[in-house]
Amino acid sequence: DAAAAAWLLVSVSLDGAPALVIVPKDALGADALTREVVIDETRRSYKVRLDGVRVSADQLLSGASAVQTLAHIDLVTSLLVAAEMCGGTASCIDYTVDYLKTRKQFGKLIGSYQALKHPTVDALIAYEQARSHVYAAAHSFSEQGEGEIATRMAKAQAATAMSFAADRAIQFHGGFGFTYDCDAQLYRRRAFWGDSQHGDAAYQRKKLADLMF
């Protein structure tokens, strides 16, 4: 959240190579931050203008150190997003199951129909797989090579699991599920947002193919 941050870590291009710069918030101009519209309205995102900002050499990280640091930041944040999406998936499943246990259609609880039970179980299985991947990634994160593979697996599976669970939540709530009044849309928006952070599931699987084969 750029509006609340005291310092900004900015990725820049320096002579054609990536570099990192630490910028104090008070070095920015009064109109440097512009709130962006993102699909998940519970998130805050800002465009930051750095026009006229000057930094000293000790606020700059360049060369191989910058490349390694950027890669490390990418993996750390990917794992954190994956863990958050696992929690979101569990909450989404609980939300859906509560509805299936209370909503009646034709005199029967809709949760008694196999057409709804089976996809709900599929969502739970996908969640358990994602959670296992997140645990494995956290355990092996510092291991050379293995940590990156496990983290990318976790990110891909967590995004897949939450997207599936959120889609089923909207579907099972019927027409109500497509409205702003139903919280199912919040889970789908969070799934879209999380999947897009640091590479979506397809991107992660492509990187995995390069790492493993």
What are these regions (language model features)?
Residues 11-14, 22-25, 52, 74, ...:
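Short, structured patches in soluble enzyme cores that scaffold and shape functional sites
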Residues 3-6, 16-17, 42-49, 75, ...:
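A generic structural signal for well-ordered coil/turn residues at beta-strand boundaries
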Residues 72-213:
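Alpha-helical interface subdomain recognition
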Residues 1, 25-60:
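Flexible, small-/acidic-enriched active-site or ligand-binding loops
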